[in-house]
């Protein structure tokens, strides 16, 4: 595993690079069960018919991933983000359970805004990393990757620890069109 510190869009974090050895179970078993579905984010995606920002069809991801080495670039939120996320989430749940739908709705909007900042930081680091390129993915630089990103709210141990899994299908790495 490799880790680097990042900052961007006014939000810091850590990016960890791991290799997928579980046939994507660590993300796909959570999709639409206790975590949202994935989102196509890599700059090479449109060349494969994958619209940026569209929901990931898990069957399509599995088919495209077959035979490819898979990298998981995990963006981990900084401590302050984690604390803010946890507080707003708790407040929203309390309002919901108390029957205060208006207050709960406002707090859910706040939570979406918090995640919007996280996604902005995640996109910024993906753009930077593709611009830099990783030799293990391809010798050409800069690169475009096919990436399926998955927002997770908790750690594998169930602790509040927001992070984004960015699954890179390394065999589909292409050279960026530099003008």
Which residues does each predicted region cover?
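Intrinsically disordered, flexible peripheral segments
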Residues: 1-179
